[in-house]
């Protein structure tokens, strides 16, 4: 039976209204722009096709699903993440970032999602056994610019020579070649770099300073911060972090247990 003109107009109004509502919903929920430096496996890295992958990438996608928003990964230098957040270039930082009082002065942090700590990658040629051996004349310490290891060395190792380098790989190379006594970095990073350089380095995996990683948010964005914290609590309760460890951190978890070091999750 043919539709009347009135019925046709009614249907058109319905479809137009539905379309406009859909457009409005999309506009109200833009992609969640997540900043990270894709140079820290297995947390932040790229696959063989150049696409982001790793623990932090999976965590970001789970957060996006919880919020009902698509996720857009923004690859930025680590020391450029906070400036990008403050200027609105990204919505949050999820990049193995330690929550420190210094950083909390310029950005807000979520609840901690991972316990970490500063450790050492030591040259096989060096007599350094712990952080207590670093602050001595003649010692050379490699640190990555903008990290908590950089901050620690600046504040506590004035007698040593501190090499501030832009790349993690450059710090590791200095140690592996015997040009630096030690590289100060987090547990997972130290483990990964020792695993690739076992003949020329040795790890000190027991943290000499406890730290926690958290998600960075723009100051005053309390609504998003509350949603992120709710997600983290639910994700932990549902076993999400255990699943991430089983997917990405099997060898690390086993090695930590072997050495009697508490695991990060």
Descriptions of predicted regions:
Residues 29-96, 105, 164:
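Extracytoplasmic small-molecule ligand-binding "clamshell" domains
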Residues 38, 114-122, 187-233, 251-265:
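Periplasmic-binding protein-like
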Residues 80-83, 95-106, 152-155, 176-209:
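A ligand-binding cleft/hinge motif common to bilobed small-molecule-binding domains
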Residues 70-77, 143, 160-168, 174:
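Short beta-strand-to-loop elements that line the ligand-binding cleft
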Residues 57-66, 125-126, 132, 145-147, ...:
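Extended ligand-binding regions for polar small-molecule ligands
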Residues 122-140:
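Flexible hinge/capping segments at coil-to-helix
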Residues 148-165, 203, 233-265:
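Ligand-binding clefts/hinges and TM-proximal coupling segments of bilobed small-molecule sensing domains
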Residues 46-48, 60-68, 131-137, 149-166, ...:
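Ligand-binding cleft/hinge of the Venus flytrap
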């Amino acid at each position: 039976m043919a539709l009347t003109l009135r019925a046709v107009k009614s249907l058109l109004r319905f479809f137009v209204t539905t379309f406009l509502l859909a457009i409005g919903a999309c506009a109200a929920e833009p992609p969640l722009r997540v900043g990270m430096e894709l140079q820290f496996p297995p947390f932040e890295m790229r696959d063989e096709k150049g696409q982001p992958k790793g623990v932090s990438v999976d965590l970001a996608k789970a957060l996006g699903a919880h919020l009902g928003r698509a996720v857009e990964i923004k690859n930025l230098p680590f020391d450029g993440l906070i400036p990008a957040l403050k200027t609105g270039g990204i919505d949050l930082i999820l990049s193995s970032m330690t929550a420190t009082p210094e950083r909390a002065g310029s950005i807000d942090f979520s609840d901690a999602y991972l316990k970490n700590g500063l450790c050492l990658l030591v040259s096989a040629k060096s007599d350094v056994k712990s952080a207590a051996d670093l602050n001595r004349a003649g010692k050379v310490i490699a640190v990555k610019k903008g990290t908590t290891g950089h901050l620690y060395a600046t504040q506590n190792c004035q007698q040593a020579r501190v090499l501030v380098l832009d790349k993690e790989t450059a710090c590791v190379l200095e140690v592996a070649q015997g040009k630096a006594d030690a590289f100060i970095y987090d547990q997972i990073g130290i483990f990964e770099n020792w695993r690739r350089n076992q003949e020329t380095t040795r790890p000190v995996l027991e943290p000499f300073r406890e730290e926690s990683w958290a998600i960075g948010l723009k100051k005053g964005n309390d609504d998003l911060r509350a949603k992120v914290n709710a997600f983290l609590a639910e994700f932990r309760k549902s076993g999400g972090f255990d699943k991430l460890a089983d997917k990405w951190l099997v060898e690390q978890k086993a090695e930590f247990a072997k050495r009697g070091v508490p695991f990060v999750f």
